[in-house]
Design a protein with these regions (language model features):
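Catalytic core of the metallo-beta-lactamase
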Residues: 1-45, 101-135
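Active-site HxH/HxHxD metal-binding segment of metal-dependent hydrolases
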Residues: 32-120
Length: 135
């Protein structure tokens, strides 16, 4: 398993690409979908899923780009569904609204396990505080 950290966008959001056996999961694709897409392509990786730790603008910016590129699954906690559905997160500093058109699979448990890369399990722990759906 390989974990690669990318620092993306004007907010310098940490994005993680976790890969194993030519499959990948992206955690918090904040911006610059082209950079993430190039990394996937250059390493011959198939994006299986995007996992969002919360729905703030600076963590979801490349969701649609990557979904349109790969048709991967997207996971987020249901606590942030309203945030992402209403205006899909607003960048208050730039007065922009980011709309997400990709389908998001919301989960609601405080502790959830996902087997995404066949033999690797990802555990999500609900951590209310930063947003209503922080994990």
């Amino acid at each position: 398993m390989k974990i690669e950290k990318l620092v993306l966008g004007s907010y310098q959001t940490n994005c993680y690409v976790i890969s194993h056996n030519k499959m990948a999961v992206v955690i918090d694709p904040g911006a610059n979908g082209e950079i993430i897409g190039t990394l996937l392509q250059n390493n011959d990786l198939t994006l299986e899923a995007i996992f969002l730790t919360h729905g703030h603008y600076d963590h979801i910016g490349a969701v649609d780009y990557l979904y349109n590129l790969t048709k991967c699954k997207i996971y987020a906690h249901i606590g942030d569904q309203e945030l992402m559905d209403k205006e899909a997160s607003k960048n208050i500093l730039n007065f922009q609204t980011l709309e997400i058109h990709a389908p998001i699979e919301y989960f609601s448990k405080e502790f959830e396990s996902f087997t995404i890369l066949k033999d690797i399990v990802f555990d999500s722990i609900y951590t209310l505080g930063h947003s209503a759906g922080s994990v």
